[in-house]
């Protein structure tokens, strides 16, 4: 029993000390005041620069409406701004390569969310709750030899 008393006293002393102040890591901000982040989805990789502006979004030197013809893609990309209520407050420039349109959309969404998190740490809880900061790690399963596809096998005949 005396050992437990000593341990609890040590813990109490540590708790009464001043709380540790965690140093925030230096965020990726370039000399022009832009927040930089990378987003990934499937085989697509997006590099995103975010700066305070009027809500202009450029993807591979095209407007977002030109690059993504479907309106639903544009709405999902704007989801981080809707959650954080910052529509038309930031300008975005991003370059995307690899994958298809859906993968590129997911990569841009992930990159924008990460850049918003760096711009204002208050958004972290909101974006985390919306599931926008977690990387979707699902990728295409490889084709196996002796099979038609990744999971599909050749037709089996008993006799």
Curated annotation (Swiss-Prot):
Ribonucleoprotein: present as a keyword of the record? yes
Biological process annotations from GO: translation
State the superkingdom: Bacteria
Q: Which cysteines are joined by disulfide bonds?
A: none
Listed GO MF terms = RNA binding; structural constituent of ribosome
Its keywords, alphabetically, are: Ribonucleoprotein, Ribosomal protein
Instruction: Identify the PROSITE patterns for this entry.
Output: RIBOSOMAL_S9
Q: Does the keyword Ribosomal protein apply?
A: yes
Alphabetized Pfam families for the sequence: Ribosomal_S9
Q: Which GO terms describe its cellular component?
A: cytosolic small ribosomal subunit
What family does the entry list?
Belongs to the universal ribosomal protein uS9 family.
**Know the name of this protein?**
Small ribosomal subunit protein uS9
